[in-house]
């Protein structure tokens, strides 16, 4: 995503964009296990079983199967289970869109979105509380405020404003693990 069109600067090439990048793309099995153990202790449960819904074709099949095999190895096979439920893309989409009416309609799934490379701030609309096709449980007035400032704020065209807001929105989603970024650019 280009954050500075005049100078051709990509968001990831800025200090702000690099701040949300983690060594080994954030893959840290020891930290994952530690945080998982803390979550189990905090909630008073000893095992988690999740069902992932995914498209029955394409890369989601192999990636979902990989996660099913590897997450229990990282988190503890006696403490974590990932069940898989494949379905046609349209059915999965319908099920996810039903979230507003039935928050228990799915537990974990792949999400896909696209955005123009020239407006990275707009790519975050999917996590606003008011997005019309919302299909996940993240609601944050603070996030909405930052998104609105990046898109509609009086100072949005001032140097560095959108850069900081994009970095802030990204951090607000990644740090609490609202999303686990997996990128695939099919157009390049």
Question: Where does each model-flagged region fall?
Answer:
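Short helices/loops that flank or line small-molecule/ion binding pockets
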Residues: 65-76, 90-106
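Extracytoplasmic/peripheral linker and loop segments enriched in polar/acidic and small residues
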Residues: 1, 16-28, 78-94, 120-188
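Paired acidic/hydrophobic, glycine-rich loop segments that form the ligand-binding mouth/hinge
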Residues: 103-111, 181
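Append "and occasionally in soluble cytosolic enzymes with long acidic Gly/Pro-rich linkers
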Residues: 1-73, 168
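Short, well-ordered beta-strand segments
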Residues: 51-53, 109, 183
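Short beta-strand/turn micro-motifs at beta-sheet edges
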Residues: 39-42, 109, 135-136
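Extracellular/periplasmic catalytic domains that process cell-envelope and extracellular macromolecules
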Residues: 43-46, 100-104, 141, 173-175
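Solvent-exposed loop/turn segments at secondary-structure junctions
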Residues: 56-60, 89-90, 113-118, 187-188
